[in-house]
């Protein structure tokens, strides 16, 4: 499972001109699911991201987590994180999980974050979405459960 975590001051996701998810500040998480991923990976990432200390404390050191700053997560499914660009100019996405598994683990990831007390807004799995955000820092962190 792969995740791109961007610290943001605000973010929203729209589908066909309608805003379906919005956060004030926190993380925008782009989540990709691989074919061998299980709920263990989604739980692991949710726990890591919920405890990720990249918000500034009073002396300016990255030392605070989402809960410490009242942060939220905007979670977006992103199968393109599994793009293979080694051959040709058009990426292959055969390394991504099938949609049923991807959706199930995306929902499990969001449910785990909520169970950990993190407010979560979402896009639509498989939807054609427009995501806008104001990066803070910018701070962008990459996670790949294959590397844990």
Swiss-Prot record:
Pfam families, sorted: Tyr_Deacylase (PF02580)
First-listed, main subcellular location of the protein, grouped into a coarse class: cytoplasm
Signal peptide: none
Tagged with keyword tRNA-binding: yes
GO MF, any single term: Ser(Gly)-tRNA(Ala) hydrolase activity
Subcellular localization(s) per the UniProt record: Cytoplasm
An individual GO BP term: D-amino acid catabolic process
Keywords, sorted A to Z: Cytoplasm, Hydrolase, RNA-binding, tRNA-binding
Residues spanned by motif Gly-cisPro motif, important for rejection of L-amino acids: 137-138
HAMAP family in the record: Deacylase_Dtd
Subunit field text: Homodimer.
PANTHER family attached to this UniProt entry: D-AMINOACYL-TRNA DEACYLASE 1, D-TYROSYL-TRNA TYR DEACYLASE
Similarity annotation: Belongs to the DTD family.
Domain text: A Gly-cisPro motif from one monomer fits into the active site of the other monomer to allow specific chiral rejection of L-amino acids.
Role noted for this protein: An aminoacyl-tRNA editing enzyme that deacylates mischarged D-aminoacyl-tRNAs. Also deacylates mischarged glycyl-tRNA(Ala), protecting cells against glycine mischarging by AlaRS. Acts via tRNA-based rather than protein-based catalysis; rejects L-amino acids rather than detecting D-amino acids in the active site. By recycling D-aminoacyl-tRNA to D-amino acids and free tRNA molecules, this enzyme counteracts the toxicity associated with the formation of D-aminoacyl-tRNA entities in vivo and helps enforce protein L-homochirality.
Protein name, UniProt field: D-aminoacyl-tRNA deacylase
């Amino acid at each position: 499972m792969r995740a791109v975590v961007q610290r943001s001051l605000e973010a929203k996701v729209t589908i066909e001109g309608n805003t379906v998810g919005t956060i004030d500040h926190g993380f925008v998480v782009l989540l990709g699911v691989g074919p061998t991923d299980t709920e263990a990976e989604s739980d692991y990432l949710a726990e890591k991201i919920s405890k990720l200390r990249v918000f500034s404390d009073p002396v300016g050191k990255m030392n605070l987590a989402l809960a410490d700053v009242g942060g939220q997560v905007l979670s977006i499914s992103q199968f393109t994180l599994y793009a293979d660009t080694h051959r040709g100019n058009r990426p292959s996405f055969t390394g991504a999980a099938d949609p049923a598994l991807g959706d199930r683990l995306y929902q499990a990831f969001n449910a785990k974050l909520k169970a950990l007390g993190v407010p979560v807004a979402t896009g639509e799995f498989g939807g054609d979405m427009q995501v806008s955000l104001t990066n803070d820092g910018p701070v962008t962190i990459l996670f790949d459960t294959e590397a844990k």
